[in-house]
């Protein structure tokens, strides 16, 4: 005790820091002290012990504290504690005089044939705490043992050693982590250790950690690890209630079902009736209900009563995913049978399968019992007694690091927020291959979802053809704001529900808004999300491509669509259509499938010989696309291209970086931003309905040779060469000198042979016209 001024401060000097554990070698390479654990010691481990939850929690907390000061995250500490428990308890026999004993030595009188430690206390300079000098003897009486958990040497580098380190050459891989004798570990404690570990780790993470440990230590040690893994999950009886009120255990299932009730998105007469019936049966037929709720996924029960109309509504409102199959009496998980039909639910919704059985009065046979594996401690004794680490050692597999240290989690880089509704609803999908970026924009998507009808009186049976047994389109609505089309499918075998087919363009928020608008106009009670995207059309532009014609000339076969050619390529079994000016369309796919198609197609495009990109222009146009989340209209793109071309001619090609910075500044400040609601290039019915037919057909036109011509007839993505070619060939240019300067600059700066040849022909044509 130290005195500080007028107050007394009690300072307790602990040589162990925040943990009371210590490390001791087991000498596996030389004499293997672990092989000398007597059968009496194994019997002690496996004997039945009274479970005191406070003591067990104190032990596992001490195992957690052994992880070391560098491990700051609870999940990493839990993994190291799990690995120690998987390697299992170990005892190191020794002989010492009574006056040399401490809190780590437990009495254990037995005759040892193999080597044991002879230890005596020493004040050696190699340590600031009392340590033991030691020697190894054979065929000697063991008076005490050190008890703890087997560990790897790298896990215990921060722990003080029991033995004197100046005489210790630590070349062995295994050590023992020993604890005070009042913290003895028994096999009975293992399932309770699992309860503590599950506060920080999921079962999947526990299994993954076990597999990593087995792959690190080799197959010969796998048996020992697997035995202790099974012991963790070895509850053979109901845990003691202890201080918990018995009322809680009697109402445990009711509380769990109440949690399911709270997870239901919408409560109505369907969900209320379902849970009320289940609650009533649990209260009135407790044993029957518990057996039904505990039914294994491997069992395929058959029910005798099922109301299909009510069953379909229950699936919708409870969000239960069910697959309907023919009952072929095959092995099936998570299913039940009604008549000749097999209904299979998802593995994560097995509890709902059992609740449905309870609701529809499934009679549980008495002989139907779950055969759960029971871990016997006798099996543990037989295996561990034969298991010597000297025989079990195995070399590391090739490529496996010798370390097994859990590193503290690194702070993750802040990522962009997720797309609302998922990547299937993304307005833009970007991929990158090298320095080239490809942006795909969704033109429209078709989605299916379920809905329930609110007014059955509107449907008259005789209006529906009796021969029509499948769904057909009952209604079709087209809306202007937001612009979308809805087809309503109604089947004559179910007048309470309908399927909706929605054709829309835009983000997920627009889709939700469209559903609200649709619900105001029709007799729909509830809409069930998430919607399934069954079709999605996308459009892409190859920005900054100098020789755009080579994209469609890479294959011989060209399909003719309407009045212009379209080259069809195939990527991941999806046909990609390439039009003039490097514009493509990708049908059917969205989300990750669309990304894979884009990467494959971009890789194919990059392999085209002679392909040349103006990377500065490519970067500017891609930035403008990503800024506006829309494809760039023709006039905006030409304004940007020729403004940049004029600046390059004014500043000179040597100062192109200055021009690039100017253009980046203009784009970042919104000079080239445009209205996304332009319908000049669309042919979608509901897109045109937004502004009306007359305005939708009002595509910008120019007069060339006393004839009106659509401004984008050469392609929305036309580059400067395509526009100059059109102007020169039309012969309507007034100041030919300006066009000659533009073409000469393109000839000087372009690296594409096709571009230079085309520019030379255009210059020859213009020069001839100037002379004449």
UniProtKB/Swiss-Prot annotation:
What the entry lists under InterPro entries is as follows:
Herpes_UL87_C (IPR004285), Herpes_UL87_N (IPR007618)
Highest taxon of the lineage: Viruses
Which spans of this chain does the record mark as coiled coil? none
Family stated for the protein in its record? Belongs to the herpesviridae UL87 family.
Q: Name one Pfam family in it.
A: DUF587
This chain's protein is named: Protein U58
